[in-house]
From Swiss-Prot:
InterPro entries, alphabetized: GyrA/parC_rep, Gyrase/topoIV_suA_C, Topo_IIA-like_dom_sf, Topo_IIA_A/C_ab, Topo_IIA_A_a_sf, Topo_IIA_dom_A, Type_II_DNA_Topoisomerases
Names of the cofactor(s): Mg(2+)
Activity regulation remarks: Inhibited by quinolone antibiotic ciprofloxacin and coumarin antibiotic novobiocin, but at much higher concentrations than is usual for DNA gyrase/topoisomerase.
Keyword Lipid metabolism listed: no
Region feature (Disordered): 694-713
Protein name: Topoisomerase subunit TopoM
All residue ranges annotated as the Topo IIA-type catalytic domain in the record: 41-504
Name of the gene: topoM
Length: 713
């Protein structure tokens, strides 16, 4: 038995003569281009994504301006999706809630109700909240009625919408943006609006301004959530090229046994940090945590308290939080935005500011052209009225004596030498208004229109005149950002050292900021996250702690070392000859000579022990040197105006944990050492003028020139 399949006759108009691969590739490409240009990537000019632009336009059209009554969020978002945005209402409300969030650098929407206060907050349902434009938000739409930007039909052709908003401040740089599309992603950090406005004025005046000047005007990001930028690596590259990686750190303060988290890096949610801490405690990686509580509320903001166990240091817990959780992370900036052809590309900070200034020039030009057209038309009508006023009785007689409007129009044109447009305007006036025309008022209006015509004509034809107007308007717009809420929130801690590195799998390792290299004195390091020890080894931190590792050739991860502000040196003490000690030199001119036997070897997970007791006023270890009394070795210490050579034999051997002894008295105007190293006795740049001195004697004043030790003769 043979089965047959009845195939209905197909409409040839519905049949595609195309392979499935070609079909899907075509439609995937179409969707990709759509997601890039109409959803995820903002414009470089007004700094807004299409959904954000449509939301603000709808609010402007609904008169939801500052001072006016706000409208229920569900009604606003429904109007946007119904009239302008062919997508779901949930995504529109999410975008609106983000623009009304407290952690937004500049709040574009004034939200009434439970909108997000910290990153990760979920807003109340749209039926419970209301919204209207804030003052900065209204500045983005203020010139829409001046025909300042192009308008295009909406998706259904029933409305029109602007291709860009006539923004009076650069939204993209001030508020930042994050978006992922097919093949493209943008991640723009927020910046301080005052700094950005100052940079706009500077580039408007000097378009070829140097990068150094730009980096001074905009030294780095400034998020509404606060946090801090650690170090300078990647910042200049980001500002000058639009792409760069830099480290961002949350704010953790120590109060007794508690570590209090009050600020998070951008894009990091509170629950993400708490979940990570719980996982670390459960896995044993953070064994010193006794408790964690979330005391966050809407009045005081973020407050997560992590309590250290008895016998554990809260400072150490703080360091582990920075190293092992997203509280310190790398921000990979990528300034991707759409150009005038709606094509994505990379922009530098300078490029984005110039694009904004180009938008402002276009806005001033188009609104001036629109206003010039209106002024020209009014001047023409006023000129006709002034001719009519020369003999108002004759004009009234012509109008009353005419049987039709056409006859009256022709009569006025012939009698007063005016054109049809002027005659129609006269005929549109009521007779009582026509007879009460005041020549003085007409003359004053004509003079005012003449002056405005000349000014507008100059703006249309002269780019330099538009530049002056743009600068004046930037000054006025900058007044929006005078309040304390626009003070810099993100700390730029350029002198700090990043302590952690995040990998794709979530693991983190310690980073040593300096690339230590192996030399004949045993200083070493490895740039791949491991310290390769041989025998026994020291690791010395700038806060005076030391770690004595065990194992013959045993590598240990930097992640196993408790975090400190910086690692001063790494010394292989196990291979030193008999009689060698470790000298720890502090910035305040003290030295501690320690016998390695005073420190017991520790495993890789050891927390280290006290090395030298530091002064409270910013003291730190600046050098860790293996020293010996043999071979005439001495310590060369260098300050800003002086240097000193101290023989090792004059430095007493002390127990670890002491404050050390003073060995470099400072000359007037000094209070800190710059460096210290091992020197052959009596030689500084080949000069024997620098002699070894007893430890307590004054140092020798120098010129500040290079005084590094010279090779032995």
């Amino acid at each position: 038995m043979t089965a047959t399949l009845d195939v209905p006759e197909q409409n040839p108009d519905l049949v595609l003569d195309q392979s499935a691969d070609d079909y899907w590739n075509h439609y995937q490409l179409t969707f990709a281009l759509y997601s890039v240009s109409d959803r995820a990537i903002p414009s470089a000019y007004d700094g807004l994504k299409p959904g954000q632009r449509r939301l603000l336009y709808q609010m402007h059209d609904s008169k939801l301006l500052p001072g006016n009554k706000p409208q229920k969020s569900s009604k606003v978002c429904s109007a946007v999706t119904g009239n302008l945005h062919p997508h779901g209402g949930a995504s529109m409300y999410g975008a609106a809630a983000l623009m009304a969030a407290d952690f937004q650098r500049v709040k574009v929407i004034d939200g009434q109700g439970a909108f997000p206060r910290i990153q990760g907050d979920i807003p109340a349902a749209d039926r419970y909240t209301e919204m209207r434009l804030s003052a900065p938000g209204a500045a983005l739409t203020a010139e829409l009625n001046d025909h300042a930007v192009p308008m295009v039909p909406t998706f259904d052709g029933e409305w029109v919408e602007p291709t860009v908003l006539p923004a009076q401040w650069p939204v993209l740089l001030c508020n930042g943006a994050v978006g992922i599309a097919e093949g493209w992603a943008t991640k723009v950090p927020a910046h301080n609006p005052r700094e950005v406005m100052a940079a706009c004025r500077a580039l408007l005046k000097t378009p070829n301004m140097t990068d150094d000047r730009l980096c001074k005007l905009i030294p780095g990001p400034d998020w509404g959530s606060g946090a801090s930028v650690v170090g300078t690596a990647g910042l200049r590259e980001y500002i000058t090229t639009g792409r760069g990686h830099f480290t961002v750190r949350g704010t953790i303060s120590v109060e007794g046994k508690n570590c209090i988290i009050t600020e998070l890096p951008p894009g990091v949610a509170s629950n993400t940090v708490q979940d990570r801490i719980r996982a670390l405690v459960e896995s044993g990686e953070m064994s010193g945590v006794a408790d964690m509580s979330d005391l966050t509320d809407r009045r005081n903001g973020l407050r997560i308290v992590v309590t250290a166990k008895r016998g554990h240091n809260a400072e150490q817990i703080r360091d582990q939080l920075l190293a092992l959780t997203p509280l310190e992370s790398t921000f990979a900036a990528s300034l991707v935005a759409l150009d005038e052809n709606r094509v994505p590309r990379w922009w530098s900070v300078r490029d984005l500011i110039m694009a904004f200034l180009q938008l402002r020039d276009s806005v001033v030009l188009h609104r001036s052209e629109y206003r010039l057209e209106k002024v020209t038309a009014r001047r023409h009508l006023v000129a006709g009225l002034m001719k009519i006023h020369l003999d108002i009785d004759a004009a009234v007689a012509v109008i009353r004596g005419s049987e039709t409007v056409d006859e009256a129009r022709k009569g006025l044109q012939e009698r007063f030498k005016i054109d049809a447009e002027q005659a129609d305007y006269v005929l549109s006036l009521q007779l009582r208004r026509l007879t009460k025309l005041d020549v003085i008022e007409l003359q004053a209006e004509a003079e005012k229109l003449d002056a405005e015509f000349a000014e507008l004509n100059d703006l249309v034809t002269n780019p330099e005149s538009r530049r002056k107007v743009i600068d004046k308007e930037l000054v006025e717009t900058a007044k929006l950002f005078k309040g304390p809420e626009y003070d810099r929130r993100t700390v730029l801690d350029f002198d700090a050292t990043p302590v952690s590195r995040g990998d794709e799998d979530g693991s983190r390792e310690r980073k040593v900021n300096t690339a230590w290299r192996l030399d004949d004195r045993g200083v070493f390091s490895d740039s791949h996250g491991e310290l390769l020890t041989s025998g026994l080894g020291w690791a010395v931190w700038s806060d005076g702690r030391i770690k004595f590792t065990t194992g013959n050739g045993l590598p240990f991860k930097i992640r196993d070392i408790p975090v400190a502000p910086d690692i001063t040196g790494l010394v292989r003490s196990g291979v030193l000859p008999e009689g060698y000690h470790l000298a720890l030199v502090t910035r305040r001119g003290k030295i501690l000579r320690v016998d390695p036997a005073s420190v017991n070897p520790q495993g890789v997970a050891g927390n280290g022990v006290a090395g030298v007791k530091l002064a409270a006023d910013g003291d730190e270890v600046i050098a860790a040197l293996p020293v010996s009394c043999a071979n005439g070795e001495a310590i060369l210490s260098i300050a800003e105006k002086s240097w000193k050579v101290t023989e090792v034999a004059d430095i007493p051997v002390k127990g670890r944990g002491g404050a050390g002894v003073a060995f470099h008295p400072f000359v007037k105007g000094e209070d800190a050492l710059l460096a210290a190293s091992i020197s052959k006795t009596g030689y500084v740049r080949g000069k024997r003028a620098v002699r070894p001195e007893n430890r307590a004697k004054a140092s020798i004043k120098g010129s500040g020139a290079d005084v590094t030790p010279a090779p032995a003769e």
